[in-house]
Every structure is written in structure tokens, then in C-alpha cells.
């Protein structure tokens, strides 16, 4: 009898261990939520430190989308859960945060925020059956090597090329200056693409100035060189933190009609110059998102965001918001599966009508959508329209006429 009891006990233990092993394999890094009640989304980004404005925007945009989707019934009947971890902008911390999210049971990753940390997270995710729906990591190669990684934002070489084309399409200038960070992948990537396209369009780079992380407090030499060059546009493919320093030191040194032209890294510039928002006057920023757009989807998003966070959403918030809706569309297209392989297979087949535009994806993970530009004046950013372009074209024509008159005299 005693042996029989022991045998029954051992059989029960073996059965329990088999169940436990089965549960672990169902959830341990597979990304598949088919047997769970919720779909877990995880994000990583700087919530503290100098780049916290970007991370908080991404977190808030994603949170808002999750709340809306859950209130509308979820995705295939399942509610979404979101966990967003602080990376402090450090790639190693970002990978550690990604591991923490995998231990939590994350099904889909929203990637990271900055390009450097994104590359590290995407590489770490390669071995897991998890879709990475990258929100804002824009360096060309930061999603390379992982065929389950897709992104919402523009990639850097696209932004640099689009910026150069925008100059000629809107007759902004035929000669430009450039100020970029030579030890930053984001800045260098945009710079290289911009210069290459300027060569194709006939725009002359008249003056180029650089800085590094170690020299990011005093830009007086660069400001003076660019101001004395007489260019009407200075291309600044840098982040808002450094842009605020540059613009503060540049105030009063340039003519009133000079544009400071940048890409998505400038988003949040007004918050960096809140002591005097006119420092950002004539900043022109390439973006797929404009908070003052008449699009009903954008208006609804802006109102909901303002109600929730008492702030106007920037492009980073909009990208994250669209990323969550893209996850929803992919899960629905994959018949409810959250397997990374299944979601990656359907990504090139879906279309998402987002607040950053109509999006489709190529097999390489990059998105296809249109870009526009925002012009800042007196602390307000508005879509840069034809009236602005006509003013710029008129200024160019006037300069040419003045030059011709001087030559005749």
C-alpha cells in the first residue's frame, strides 16, 4: 500500500512537471498570445535624462492607442497590455529592459526610441519569435538583420533625400549651409543623404560646420562661419537638445529670412527653448505629422492627447500611436496570431490609415508614406504652405535682382 501511494505521488509530480514545461514553452519568448487573455506590448526608451522628451512622447502615444483599442473591444476579443521601460537612452540599458519585458511575457515589441538603442534591441530580438514594430529608431541599418522588424518612422537617408528635394521643390534656396554632429549616426546619416541629393538637384553646399558630443556647448565659431556665408537655409540634422543650444547662440546673428531646416530630431524644440520661444523662429522641420492638420483623425488624436496629458502631441507620440494601431491591423490580418513570424508575413500586405499618414510596408521593414514640413513662428508650428514658399522664392528672386543691379552699376 505504501509503495502504491508513493507511485501515485510520483506520477502526479511528473504530470505537473509536464504541464509546467508546456506552459513555459508556450510563453517563453515565442511571442504567441493564442493561449492568453491579453496581448502584451512592450516598449523601451529614455524616460529620464536629456532625451526623456522623446521617450515620454512615445510612451504617451502608445498608452493612448492602447486605451482606445481596449475601450472599443480590443483585438480579436483580447485586451492589450502595455509596459514601457526606461533605457535612459543607453543601448546596454535598453537591452536589459528588453530582457525584462520578455520575462514579463511580451508578445509584440514596440522597439526603442533612439537609433542606437533601437539597433541593440532589434539585434537582441532576432532570436525571439517577436514582431518588432519600431516607433522612432530612424538610422538606416538599425532594423537590419531581423526580418521580423518593421518601423513606423522614416529612415534617415529618406529624410535627408526628402529634405534636399524639398529645397528645390519649394524654391527655398540654391545655396545652403550645413551644421551636423559628426559622431552621431542619426546626424551623419541625414547629412550624407542630403549632400548626395543636393548634388543631384544642383543645390550648392556653401558652408559646412560640425560638432561632437564633447564640443556641444559652445557653437560660436560654427554660428559665425555659417552666418557670414550668407546662405538662406542652414540644414541642421540634429536633435532638439543641441539645436536649442545652436539656435540660442545663433539668435540675432542671421538675417531674419534664414530658415533652419531639420528632420524629426527637432521635434520638441519648443520645449527646449521655453524661456524664449522666438529662438525657434524660422525652424522648418520635415515630418509626417502636423498637429494643426484638418484631417479628422489627426484632430481627434490631438484632442484626446491634450485631454490626457495636457500637451500637444509631437511626431514621436504620433508614431507610437500609429505603431499600436499597426500591431492591431497585423494581428487581425494574421487571424489573431501574435507569433512574430506570422505577423512579419502579413506586414507587407496591410495598409494603415494613421495620424502620420497612409502607411504600407516593404519587405525590408521600411514604411512608405508622405512627408510635409512644419514652420515655427512665435512658439507655434504650422504646416509650411505655398504662401511661405512663394515668400522664399520672392526673396531668392529679389537677391538675384539686387546682385544683377549691383553688377550693372
Give the label of every model feature segment:
Residues 1-40, 71, 388-409:
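Short, low-complexity disordered leader/linker segments with a strong preference
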Residues 26-32, 54-60, 72-143, 211-217, ...:
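Beta-alpha junction/loop-to-helix N-cap segments that form part of ligand/metal-binding clefts
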Residues 101-113, 132-135, 177-180, 230-240, ...:
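Periplasmic-binding protein-like
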Residues 193-286:
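Extracellular/periplasmic bilobed ligand-binding domains
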Residues 250-321, 381, 387:
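Extracellular/periplasmic periplasmic-binding protein-like sensory domains
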Amino acid at each position: 500500500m505504501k509503495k502504491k501511494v508513493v507511485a501515485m505521488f510520483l506520477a502526479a509530480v511528473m504530470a505537473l512537471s509536464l504541464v509546467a514545461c508546456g506552459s513555459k514553452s508556450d510563453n517563453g519568448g515565442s511571442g504567441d498570445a493564442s493561449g492568453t487573455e491579453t496581448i502584451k506590448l512592450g516598449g523601451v526608451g529614455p524616460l529620464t535624462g536629456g532625451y526623456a522628451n522623446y521617450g515620454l512622447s512615445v510612451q504617451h502615444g502608445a498608452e493612448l492607442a492602447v486605451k482606445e483599442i481596449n475601450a472599443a473591444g480590443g483585438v480579436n476579443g483580447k485586451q492589450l497590455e502595455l509596459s514601457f521601460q526606461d533605457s535612459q537612452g543607453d543601448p546596454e540599458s535598453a537591452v536589459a529592459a528588453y530582457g525584462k519585458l520578455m520575462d514579463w511575457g511580451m508578445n509584440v515589441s514596440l522597439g526603442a526610441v533612439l537609433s542606437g538603442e533601437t539597433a541593440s534591441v532589434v539585434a537582441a530580438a532576432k532570436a525571439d519569435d517577436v514582431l518588432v514594430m519600431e516607433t522612432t529608431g530612424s538610422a538606416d541599418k538599425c532594423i537590419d538583420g531581423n526580418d521580423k522588424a518593421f518601423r513606423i518612422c522614416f529612415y534617415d537617408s529618406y529624410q535627408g533625400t526628402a529634405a534636399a528635394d524639398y529645397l528645390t521643390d519649394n524654391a527655398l534656396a540654391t545655396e545652403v549651409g550645413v551644421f551636423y554632429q559628426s559622431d552621431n549616426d542619426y546626424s551623419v546619416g541625414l547629412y550624407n543623404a542630403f549632400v548626395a541629393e543636393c548634388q543631384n538637384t544642383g543645390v550648392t553646399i556653401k558652408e559646412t560646420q560640425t560638432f561632437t558630443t564633447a564640443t556641444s556647448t559652445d557653437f560660436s565659431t560654427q554660428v559665425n562661419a555659417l552666418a557670414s556665408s550668407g546662405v538662406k537655409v542652414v540644414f541642421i540634422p540634429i536633435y532638439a537638445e543641441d539645436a536649442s543650444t545652436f539656435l540660442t547662440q545663433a539668435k540675432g546673428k542671421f538675417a531674419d529670412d534664414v530658415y533652419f531646416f531639420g528632420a524629426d530630431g527637432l521635434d520638441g524644440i519648443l520645449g527646449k527653448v521655453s524661456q524664449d520661444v522666438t529662438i525657434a523662429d524660422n525652424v522648418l522641420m520635415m515630418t509626417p505629422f502636423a498637429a494643426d492638420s484638418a484631417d479628422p483623425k489627426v484632430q481627434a488624436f490631438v484632442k484626446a492627447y491634450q485631454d490626457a496629458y495636457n500637451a500637444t502631441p509631437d511626431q514621436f507620440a504620433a508614431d507610437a500611436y500609429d505603431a499600436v494601431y499597426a500591431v492591431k491591423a497585423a494581428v487581425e490580418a494574421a487571424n489573431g496570431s501574435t507569433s512574430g513570424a506570422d505577423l512579419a508575413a502579413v506586414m507587407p500586405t496591410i495598409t494603415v490609415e494613421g495620424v502620420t499618414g497612409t502607411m504600407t510596408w516593404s519587405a525590408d521593414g521600411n514604411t512608405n508614406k508622405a512627408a510635409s514640413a512644419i514652420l515655427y513662428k512665435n512658439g507655434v508650428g504650422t504646416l509650411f504652405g505655398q504662401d511661405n514658399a512663394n515668400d522664399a522664392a520672392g526673396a531668392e528672386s529679389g537677391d538675384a535682382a539686387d546682385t544683377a543691379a549691383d553688377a550693372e552699376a
